[in-house]
């Protein structure tokens, strides 16, 4: 497990935003033995040290809530750390890529030596955390990360085989694809009588994990769209394996993310090549490992690199080997982008799924407007798209944090059937005739962390050693200091808004919030045609009810069997 977890950090990562929704497990008191003939008492209320169970840390302590992770998953997730990244880079000489003689293709060398191609994807929330820590813009933080992972002054400088990441990509690219397809999914669900409404976002793995193990009745509501992390993993593995003629296990993909839950997402068996390649494959993960923003700094420290001194300018494009498909290369590494960086501030810091869906829907209804209604706290907001004549066309909402998610899930819970013959379902008597059991939303953006993804558990915190200079003397970071720090990270997240080049993609005229749906769909169609795979198998995923073994007496044999049987476990 990553060294970022220590006995000094036993609190839930979303504290003090919300209280833990699961009670602490109370262990039964030991029964006194009948063989004891003597009783010894002490004049103190303090228990003996031997009476206290040793404090232990598992992935359960880091994820969204207690009891949402099985022990088998905890083992799988604990293997992902900055140490694993360095171990992979030093395991064998990497595959060498060259332009062929004509300059129209990529040549691969070193396949027989057991090496791999290394690719990294970086989230904008992680860049924002780095930017706030070192006092730079989000874009400059991205350049520093790129120099660390693939530049001459980065980790390759002290590596055994001088391996580095061949490509460092921005997950904002696949985020745009997720926004377009997600918006179309919502619109399609409004006319499909067989679909469950509302559609709930599924890009937050903490929320998905909680739903699968605690509230399986909401699973039919989850969006089928993969997250930007997962979609990027599939895009990289499928394209490189097809274009370079190598197996997916020769491509090693690491993602830099803001929360620990993304490690769990990468371990899902639904996100392996077994899904898009078909049966009979080994189940190679689309994302091999996930490290957090904080672990990225630990990666630099492990190589003796002072992160703050890394260049804040881009690596020359002339030194980059182009991606082996021209159209996908221009998609992943656009020379000019028309948009607003990480999106409008009204979209929030979690990708803007809801914001884009509202504007996409409004763009198809001329004269309509978007109205905002604030909820009982800052993490609950209702939205409506209203026609020119005042008719409500769509209702949507944003629910962040588990305290608010609890209320949403409760409203979606189906009524219990009556035990009396001919009786109405329990709870239906309080509903007006014809009113559905759940809310009348068409779409709800759900995130586990209060404030959104910039407040993820893997982000650099105000009281971390690198930020101790911000605190005066021995003062500890309280709720107010943490709130101010999160505001700085949010500001860094949007710091790239004014720096985006003003140029369009193919000069399309169908832009919605800076994104061209036709360009996205054309690129995705090209991807499917290039790989020879059905687009639905590439961009969509599934969910299932999972029974957690946390707090249950599960033997080691059962745990080993569960891990060994997991498709994405690497066994």
UniProtKB/Swiss-Prot annotation:
Keyword Iron-sulfur in record: yes
Binding-site residues for [4Fe-4S] cluster 2, renumbered to this chain: 204, 259, 449, 453
Pfam families in the cross-refs: Fe_hyd_lg_C (PF02906)
Family to which the UniProt record says this protein belongs: Belongs to the NARF family.
Gene (name only): NAR1
GO terms for biological process, alphabetical: iron-sulfur cluster assembly
Record has Secreted as a keyword: no
Keyword set, alphabetical order: 4Fe-4S, Iron, Iron-sulfur, Metal-binding
GO CC annotation terms, alphabetical: cytosolic [4Fe-4S] assembly targeting complex
Task performed by this protein: Component of the cytosolic Fe/S protein assembly machinery. Required for maturation of extramitochondrial Fe/S proteins. May play a role in the transfer of pre-assembled Fe/S clusters to target apoproteins.
Region (Disordered): 415-437
Record GO terms (molecular function): 4 iron, 4 sulfur cluster binding; iron-sulfur cluster binding; metal ion binding
Binding site for [4Fe-4S] cluster 1: 20, 62, 65, 68
Name the UniProt record assigns to this protein: Cytosolic Fe-S cluster assembly factor NAR1
């Amino acid at each position: 497990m990553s060294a970022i977890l220590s006995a000094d950090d036993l609190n839930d990562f979303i504290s003090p935003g919300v209280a833990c929704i699961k009670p602490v497990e109370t262990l039964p008191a030991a029964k006194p033995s009948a063989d004891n003939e003597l009783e010894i008492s002490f004049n103190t209320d303090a228990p003996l040290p031997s009476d206290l169970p040793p404090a232990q840390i598992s992935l359960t302590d880091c994820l969204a809530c207690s009891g949402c992770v099985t022990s088998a998953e905890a083992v799988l997730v604990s293997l992902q750390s900055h140490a694993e990244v360095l171990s992979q880079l030093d395991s064998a000489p990497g595959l060498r890529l060259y332009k062929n003689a004509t300059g129209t293709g990529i040549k691969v060398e070193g396949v027989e030596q057991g090496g791999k191609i290394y690719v990294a994807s970086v989230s904008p929330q992680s860049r924002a955390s780095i930017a706030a820590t070192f006092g730079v813009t989000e874009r400059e933080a991205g350049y520093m990360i790129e120099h660390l992972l693939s530049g001459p002054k980065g980790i390759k400088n002290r590596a055994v085989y001088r391996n580095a990441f061949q490509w460092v990509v921005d997950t904002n690219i696949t985020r745009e694809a997720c926004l377009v397809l997600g918006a179309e999914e919502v619109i399609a669900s409004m006319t499909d009588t067989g679909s469950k409404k509302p559609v709930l976002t599924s890009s937050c793995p903490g929320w998905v994990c909680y739903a699968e193990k605690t509230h399986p009745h909401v699973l039919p509501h989850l969006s089928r769209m993969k997250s930007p992390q997962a979609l990027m993993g599939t895009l990289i593995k499928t394209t490189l394996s097809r274009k370079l003629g190598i197996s997916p296990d020769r491509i090693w993909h690491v993602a830099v993310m803001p929360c620990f839950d993304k490690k769990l997402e990468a371990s899902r068996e639904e996100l392996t090549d077994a899904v898009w390649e078909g049966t009979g494959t080994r189940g190679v993960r689309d994302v091999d490992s996930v490290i957090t923003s904080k672990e990225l700094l630990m990666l630099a420290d492990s190589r003796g690199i002072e992160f703050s001194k890394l260049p804040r300018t881009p690596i020359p494009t002339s030194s980059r080997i182009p991606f082996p498909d021209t159209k996908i290369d221009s998609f992943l590494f656009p020379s000019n982008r028309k948009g607003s960086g990480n999106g409008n501030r009204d979209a929030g810091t979690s990708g803007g799924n809801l914001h884009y869906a509202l504007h996409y829907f409004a763009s198809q209804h001329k004269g309509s407007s978007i109205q905002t209604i604030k909820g009982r706290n800052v993490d609950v907001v209702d939205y409506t798209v209203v026609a020119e004549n005042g008719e409500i066309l769509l209702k949507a909402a944003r629910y962040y944090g588990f305290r608010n998610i609890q209320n949403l899930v409760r409203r979606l819970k189906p009524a219990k059937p009556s035990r009396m013959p001919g009786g109405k379902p329990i709870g239906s008597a309080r509903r007006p005739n014809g009113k559905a059991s759940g809310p009348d939303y068409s779409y709800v953006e759900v995130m586990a962390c209060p404030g959104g993804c910039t407040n993820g558990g893997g982000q650099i915190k105000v009281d971390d050693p690198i930020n101790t200079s911000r605190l005066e003397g021995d003062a500890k970071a309280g709720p107010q200091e943490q709130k101010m720090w999160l505001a700085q990270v949010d500001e860094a997240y949007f710091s790239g808004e004014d720096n985006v080049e003003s140029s369009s993609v193919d000069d399309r005229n169908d832009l919605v919030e800076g994104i061209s749906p036709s360009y996205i769909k054309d690129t995705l169609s090209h991807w499917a045609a290039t790989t020879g795979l059905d687009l639905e198998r590439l961009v969509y995923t599934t969910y299932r009810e999972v029974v957690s073994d946390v707090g249950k007496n599960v033997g080691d044999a059962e745990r080993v069997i569960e891990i060994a049987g997991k498709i994405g476990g690497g066994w």
